[in-house]
A protein has these predicted regions:
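ATP-dependent carboxylate activation and anion-phosphoryl transfer catalytic cores
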Residues: 69-147
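Phosphate-binding site of ATP-dependent enzymes
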Residues: 1-73, 77-80, 108
């Protein structure tokens, strides 16, 4: 037989946090994926179709938006968690940390993306803009962090 990796499904909201920096880290405003139509909870995960198939996204009312404001303690916990993950994985320059926010307000780490999509209209760039970093400056900053 073949070995398989089986993981527990974590129910909750899909949250994406961009992190920039090498020594001094900055968390960008968080984004989340929301579903406009009722879908079984177990089917709510970011598959290829969910992320990239525009017809599928329209059919199910899937969109990404900024995470509504959290309580200050939860926001602080989110940022500390993302920075700890970034450092633990020895990431540098920029990355995106994907988590689930459970009904108990716990953040569960799903994965780190060390090379997230940087298109102007994608989550990372939109979060940078909300943080006051316009697209040309974002690209300049990423290049300077790589130097």
């Amino acid at each position: 037989g073949q070995e398989a990796l089986v993981e527990e499904f974590v129910e909750g909201r899909e949250v994406y946090v961009g992190v920039m920096g090498n020594n001094r880290l900055q968390c960008l405003p968080a984004r989340e994926m929301v579903w406009g139509r009722e879908v079984p909870v177990q089917a709510r995960f970011a598959s290829y179709r969910v992320k990239w198939d525009e017809d599928y996204r329209k059919r199910w009312g899937i969109r990404n938006r900024f995470l509504p404001p959290l309580a200050k303690s939860a926001q602080r916990r989110l940022e500390v968690t993302c920075k700890e993950i970034y450092r633990h994985l020895q990431l540098n320059g920029y990355a995106r940390i994907d988590l689930r926010l459970t009904a108990d307000n716990e953040f569960v780490f799903i994965e780190a993306n060390p090379n997230p999509m940087l298109a102007r209209d994608e989550d990372f760039a939109l979060s940078a803009r909300k943080a006051g970093l316009e697209y040309p400056k974002l690209i300049e900053r990423i290049i300077s962090l790589a130097a």
